[in-house]
């Protein structure tokens, strides 16, 4: 039996990963993390979507210690979430230091226990928003460390790594779930479901990608299929 675990936030990217995983694996588990995030409504959204889409198990892990250690606008109510700034440079204040290190490591422990062969995460280097822990180099390095530490090679799959947001929308559409991802996921840093607040960086990235996809569905779909190997599907 092919078994995978999805790092699942209930946002656009991880939901698209879950939708695809359910087509490619016999059994799919989801792991969601409660770290006291400002947009913690995503946890309820994740629960709803995992149940609706058919994950066999959904584990919500309490990692509120991360909130105590990592200072970010996503972990502190007194630090405002910045509006979208297309020319911004450097690491944004929405970056939560160590988040993906912790999430992937804990998910690997869970995957080890349920005998899963793969961990799937929606990180993306193409539209990575300046987050260093969304880079391919980081994921490969952590995978190497985890494999050594567990003496077991649990694959780290990153199906969105080289897709832009328009192509990620195309992937959701390919699997017949564009409307669900658009209406029922929560990507917004301010915790607003669907199209979100329209002001934060996450909402702008999501909206711009959707508009680009809807403006050239055939072209974007073709590029996505080539990048993902779905061209033969």
Curated annotation (Swiss-Prot):
InterPro entries (UniProt xref): QueC, Rossmann-like_a/b/a_fold
Cofactor requirement: Zn(2+)
Record flagged with keyword ATP-binding: yes
Keywords: ATP-binding, Ligase, Metal-binding, Nucleotide-binding, Queuosine biosynthesis, Zinc
One term of GO molecular function: ATP binding
Example of a GO biological process term: queuosine biosynthetic process
Pathway(s) where this gene product acts: Purine metabolism; 7-cyano-7-deazaguanine biosynthesis
Matching SUPFAM superfamilies: Adenine nucleotide alpha hydrolases-like
Record: residues binding Zn(2+): 188, 197, 200, 203
Residues making up the signal peptide according to the UniProt record: none
Residues holding ATP: 8-18
Top-level taxon of the source organism: Bacteria
EC number: 6.3.4.20
Cofactor note: Binds 1 zinc ion per subunit.
Catalyzed chemical reaction(s): 7-carboxy-7-deazaguanine + NH4(+) + ATP = 7-cyano-7-deazaguanine + ADP + phosphate + H2O + H(+)
Enzyme class label: ligase
Function (record text): Catalyzes the ATP-dependent conversion of 7-carboxy-7-deazaguanine (CDG) to 7-cyano-7-deazaguanine (preQ(0)).
HAMAP family documented for this protein: QueC (MF_01633)
Xref: NCBIfam families: 7-cyano-7-deazaguanine synthase QueC, PRK11106.1
Family per record: Belongs to the QueC family.
Protein name per its UniProtKB record: 7-cyano-7-deazaguanine synthase
Biological source species: Klebsiella pneumoniae (strain 342)
Lineage: Bacteria, Pseudomonadati, Pseudomonadota, Gammaproteobacteria, Enterobacterales
Gene label: queC
